[in-house]
Amino acid sequence: MKNRKSGDAGMKYDPAQVRIHEAYTVAIRDLGVHGEGIGSVDGFTIFVPGALPGETVTAEITLLKKSYAVGELLSIEWESPFRVVPKCPVYENCGGCQLSHLTYEGQLDMKYRRVKDVIERIAGESGDLVKPVLPAAHPFAYRNKMAVPAGLVKGEAALGCYRQGSHDIIPVSSCAIQKEENNRLLQFARRFIEKYGISVYDEKTRKGSLRHVMGRVGDDGKVMVVLVTASETLPEEKRWIEGIQKELPEVISLWHNIQPKPGNTILGAKIRHLWGRETLTASLCGLQFEVSPYSFFQVHKEQAEILYEKALAYADLQGGETVIDAYCGTGTISLCLAKKAKRVIGIEIVKSAIEDAKKNAKKNHMENTEFYAADAGKLMPQLYRQGLVPDVIVMDPVRAGCSEEVLKATAGMNPKRIVYVSCNPATFARDAKILKSEGYEIKEIQPVDMFPQTMHVETVALMIRGKSK
């Protein structure tokens, strides 16, 4: 071990004296956005992946910057009572989960404090507005969608997960947060690739064929499989079909997708249906949805239902309201709202999502819905000029939050209630502050744990029009 220096022994460190490859004793006080422990040596911030709040650890400095350093966890001198042994054997290297070394109770507390912090610090509101996080009944084996990358590991074909912060493949045979049906698909694909010597894609040389194996599990346990290749043809296509039919009877739909472009986008524009049904049927809040390879659908159905039910409660619909669902996606929230509203207008800039929304509305006989493929920030003022006055506006934007145009249009339409669903507490807090300046006030914020074992937390919030608005 390198020379060990203690931050607890009364020594005062000038940040310039914290040296690369030196070991220091660090008291961990919090977790960062990626799940890393945050501590300091006399005011100089040290990030220590794998460390938990309340722990005292020894860490060797592996990266040194002017205002912070990153340390490798060498040993734990004082262990948190909330530390547990992760279920996943590759947890420390995989980038998929960040909190599996923390008890579920500890995860919920951390997420609650994270939401409360940004509401106080960014929105300038009281943390008392934040309710306790709604937990998942099953914090493992909850994901109904899997997309496993293929690649080379020491020259050999492999399926697995990406190493944290890179695209290096870590071979795995199962994932603790995936449904069992997806893990069986993963194990079959590993055996198949090895048995038939399937060519896998190498990102560095851009050669090889198989890039991803995707599985989607429906409510009834039936599975859709999508095999993604860089090549126009699927190596051993007939054997893939025969093998899946023989070994995976739960699979009812098989597709071949072609993605020749480098980058992080998994699915390409070209796709071939190989066998079985073209869609899966999934339900959400009593509604039926047809799920295609390209469709967005919530990967944790049970928690999505809890989230949507809370959003519906905040909307407080009595049957005569007009509702706008900005960022409506494939219409899942819109259709839930339509069960209790007089009229629902869904707006989404992605045309394919609007096509799915219209199909889903027809399937569920929701004739009081309208869907527009448009920029909500531009369409909403047009609708207002045409006489549309919404009682409620619901928004569920991407992680970047709402555009300025959507926030301005929302305030201009003057709805009684705004229901804001967010996958990023920080951008919600930013947008809430803007809406507050327009005369709206936050009544309540409900975090929901959609993705146990990870740093992600969803929130749904109710904002109402102030008396002076």
Residue spans for each PLM region:
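Terminal RNA-binding accessory module
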Residues: 1-90, 370, 378
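Rossmann-like S-adenosyl-L-methionine
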Residues: 2-25, 33, 232-469
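Short, acidic/hydrophobic/Gly-rich beta-strand patch recurrent on exposed beta strands
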Residues: 37-42, 160-163, 228, 357
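Short, conserved phosphate/pyrophosphate- and ester-handling motifs at nucleotide-, phospho-/glycolipid
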Residues: 54, 178, 300
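Extended interfacial segments that mediate partner engagement and assembly in macromolecular machines
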Residues: 74-86, 92-200, 234
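Short, solvent-exposed loop/turn elements at beta->coil junctions and helix N-caps
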Residues: 131-139, 203-204, 210-212, 447-450
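A short, glycine/Asx- and small/polar-enriched loop/turn
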Residues: 140-144, 219-221, 455-456
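Short, aliphatic-rich beta-strand segments
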Residues: 215, 221-230, 288-292
